[in-house]
Each structure stands twice: as structure tokens, then as C-alpha cells.
Amino acid sequence: MNEREYIGRGRRKLEHLRFFQEDSKGSNGLEDVHLVHQALPELNWSDIDLTCRWLGKTLAAPFIINALTGGPPETLAINAALARVARRTGIALAVGSQRAGLENKEWRESFTIVRRENANGLILANIGAGNSPADAGEAVAMIAADGLQVHLNAAQELIMPEGDRAFRGWLENIRGMVNTLGVPVIAKEVGFGLSRETALQLYQAGVRIMDVGGRGGTNFAAIEERRRGRSVAALAGWGLSTAVSILEIRELGLPVEVVATGGIRSALDAARALALGAKIVGAAGYFLKILLEQGEDALTEEILQWQEDLKRICLLTGCTTPAELATKPVVITGQTRAWLEGRQRH
């Protein structure tokens, strides 16, 4: 990569950071998922345990600060703060795409800082599916990661004028990562959701953890329109919502873990996703906005509030753990129900 391309990649990352703060408030479909209140839960507050084991480590709650940024020097302080917040709240953290750090050694510190600030935490590396297994291994080693997010961002690339246009071979790259890396590989969409067809392809390639990255959160079509003043209205509503994506995977009945991301903005959203069958729930843009506008302490307090709210929801649905939410009744209405009914016919 030449100097001009370095500058272009860095500028794009910083522009995305700025626009991430402008929450699109799109529908993630989880408003269609209704938990059933139990007036006689027969539980005490002390009975509720939010801790969970994931990727060999114990989390204080089934939450992750999802992939955001890294690369240009301006991102170092952001990643350092996110790592400290994850450590203080006992939840997982994923870095943004490490492609920039692989290509420019001067930018690696913006990624390695997370392990220095959170030495024992659960941290995920991140790289695109267009990269080789060797590059993926380097990304994992860079931050001593507990797992690798391999992001599937074809729609995002097509929206960006400077984005990639070659996507053949991605599945083989993923298969190679699964077979050669010594850590779990998590296939991750970045805002357009996962269909059952894609989930089956990933499963056949050996992937056992899928991050749905559903529609309803960061809207790259809207971001690109603001970045470039270039309309991409045809893709403005493209993709599968977070709720639909979780259900698409669940309908396959495969032994996979689902990470629910895409427009998660509250503990209630998280509880709804867990009730649909997710194991872990994450947010990216929502957390970033709080960090940049209110500071590190405010983000820490917000996540701790989510944990307390999730504990309340567990008690009021008769659950002693978040995992039990998946065994409780839910009512699905609206567009999500319409999607499920339509999919059964086609």
C-alpha cells in the first residue's frame, strides 16, 4: 500500500468514527419481541447470576463492546478507554479491523494498547474475510486475542466508492482460518445481517460462532451519503434486522453460538436478543457515542446500569441466569412475525 492509500484509509476510519456518533435509530426488529412478565417469579434478587463463560473466560455479564476502530493515532486513546471500560465492567471487547495495523507498523499501538490496558480480559481480534489465514494469525498474535472476528462487509465495500469489488474466495479464506488458527473464529456481519443460507455456508466451513451484525444499528449507506454527498438510497434499507437474523440462524437448528449485534441500545434489547437464542449481546456505535460525548466514566456507568437492568428483567421473567431467557415464552409481532411467516412459504 502506498502513502496515498495509507492516508485514504486513515481518513476514512476517522470519518466513520465521526459519523458513528450520529445514531441512525433504525429498527433492529427487537421491538417486535415481547417478553412475558411473571408476577410470581418465586426468586430473590440474590438468586440472579449474570456471569457467563465464553471462549474460556468468565464475563460479568453476556455483553461485548463490539468492533469499532484502530489505526490512525487519533484512535489509540479511544481503544485504550474502551479496554479500561471492558476491564472495569467485566465484559468482552473487540477491536476494529486490524488491516491498518498489518500494513502500517506505526499504527499497531492503537490495537496493542487494548491488551496492555486489559491484560486478562476477553479480547477479540478483527480482520476482513478477504484476508489470508496468515494475516488473520498475525492479527490474533498482535493483541494476544482470545478469538478472531472475521468481518463480512461486502455491502459496506460496495457502498464506498473506494471499496473492494472482489469477493470470490472469502469462504475459502474463512475455512483456512478455522483450520489453522488456535482460537475460535467468529463470522461477523457489519450492519446488514446474516441469512440462514449464509449461516449454513459458514457452518459448513467450520464456523461455530456467528455475530449477526443486523440492520438497525450503524447504517453505512447513510454514512456514505454524508461522507461523499453521494446517494445510495437503493441500499438504505438493505439487509436483515437483528431480530430476523437471530431467528434465521435458530431455525436451522445447528449447534452454533449467536452473538447479537446491530442497533442494541438497552438492556431490554439485550434481553430480547437473549430470549431469541443469542449467547452474547454487543453494541458498538451506541457505546462509542457515550464515550466520545460524555467520557469513560459515563460509559462505565451505562454498562453497569445495563447489567443491573438485565438482572431485573431476568427476575421478572423467572430466570436465574440470562441463558434461561431462551427457555421462556416470547410473543413475536409486527414485521419480524411477517418475515417469519413469509420465509415459511418461500
From Swiss-Prot:
Keywords: Cytoplasm, Flavoprotein, FMN, Isomerase, Isoprene biosynthesis, Magnesium, Metal-binding, NADP. Mg(2+) binds at E157. It is an enzyme of class 5 (isomerase). The keyword Magnesium applies. Substrate binds at R12, K13, S97, Q98, R99, Q156. Its cofactor is FMN; NADPH; Mg(2+). Its EC number is 5.3.3.2. GO terms for molecular function: FMN binding; isopentenyl-diphosphate delta-isomerase activity; magnesium ion binding; NADPH binding; oxidoreductase activity. Homooctamer. Dimer of tetramers. It catalyses: isopentenyl diphosphate = dimethylallyl diphosphate. GO terms for cellular component: cytoplasm. Belongs to the IPP isomerase type 2 family. It comes from the Bacteria. This is Isopentenyl-diphosphate delta-isomerase. FMN binds at A67, L68, T69, S97, N126, K188, T218, G263, I264, R265, A284, G285. One of its GO terms (biological process) is isoprenoid biosynthetic process. It comes from Moorella thermoacetica (strain ATCC 39073 / JCM 9320). It is found in: Cytoplasm. Involved in the biosynthesis of isoprenoids. Catalyzes the 1,3-allylic rearrangement of the homoallylic substrate isopentenyl (IPP) to its allylic isomer, dimethylallyl diphosphate (DMAPP).
